[in-house]
């Protein structure tokens, strides 16, 4: 079956689209990436998405208009990727505006989580004249799960296994980690694991936007960070914060590591040159991942033999060097080396999740999200 996958992440820079051929069994799919495309959000759209994600109050009218704009851009990306309309099914993540993980009240009662991925799915189905699977997080959240990350189980299916534990790190706005068991030995029966480590590009991008007065949306290639010096004492202090001490399952987003969080950290670095501040934020993103991997070792969990990196952050050479330095003993590779294109990977995940929905195959993993049990993810809407 040919499936379109559409993904717009927490960086809110645009939509990635893929056309994938999927066949075989659900747990060991055969796949082929046929085409890919990316479409940037207009600056005004991105700024509005980020503003809502930081908790700024907006009118119902502006949110309604935003949802229609996002949907039309998703459709345009899909048609750019699949102009001949080969796909039989579309998997669309939508644009995350807010993610609230579950938590326990003082009484011990569980408050279920909630997550808002903005999309007018019936409109998208009409514009593309194909069934759309969307709202992938809701079923896991309803079962007490985090609703995130959803990519690890799909990562394991797409990437496959090797002789040792393999780690796949996605560097989007947030850094999330997938641990894939080996293909042989006693650990082959272990479940896939995954969680959100903390900020990857979110704080760096917001800082660049602030320092450049809107002229720059990111540190291209990590060039500015490369010229600065990071504050290791400050990084150690930040690593002691509560979120980084939590054990999985755990998930987070820009509502935690967004503009308010950046303001606090910039206050900690007050008086330092801008290059040093960007260098410190970049090193911090790498240190968060390294600390999580070290905590695995402290819990007697086998360390992965390689760290496969995907997402926009893999283009930040300074961030990649920091990861290489701080994650000692791991072979660092880009997912492109394994025929899993970094830019397209998450869109491929949502194509696979849509296919799994079509097959009636569960897309979540309770060991990762904390849900009560496995469940088929997503809601299907057909063109009228």
Swiss-Prot record:
Instruction: Give the coiled coil ranges.
Output: none
Asked if Nucleotide-binding is a keyword of the record, the answer is: yes
Q: What class of enzyme is it?
A: transferase
Associated pathway: Amino-sugar metabolism; 1,6-anhydro-N-acetylmuramate degradation; Cell wall biogenesis; peptidoglycan recycling
Which SUPFAM superfamilies does the annotation name?
A: Actin-like ATPase domain
Instruction: State the Pfam families in the record.
Output: AnmK
Which residues does the record give as ATP binding sites? 9-16
Which is an annotated GO molecular function term of this record? ATP binding
Tell me the InterPro entries matching this sequence.
Anhydro_N_Ac-Mur_kinase, ATPase_NBD
Domain of life here? Bacteria
What's its catalytic activity?
Answer: 1,6-anhydro-N-acetyl-beta-muramate + ATP + H2O = N-acetyl-D-muramate 6-phosphate + ADP + H(+)
Alphabetical list of NCBIfam families matching this protein: PRK09585.2-5 (NF007145)
Q: What does this protein do?
A: Catalyzes the specific phosphorylation of 1,6-anhydro-N-acetylmuramic acid (anhMurNAc) with the simultaneous cleavage of the 1,6-anhydro ring, generating MurNAc-6-P. Is required for the utilization of anhMurNAc either imported from the medium or derived from its own cell wall murein, and thus plays a role in cell wall recycling.
Q: Which PANTHER family match?
A: ANHYDRO-N-ACETYLMURAMIC ACID KINASE
- Annotated protein name in UniProt: Anhydro-N-acetylmuramic acid kinase
Native species: Synechococcus sp. (strain CC9311)
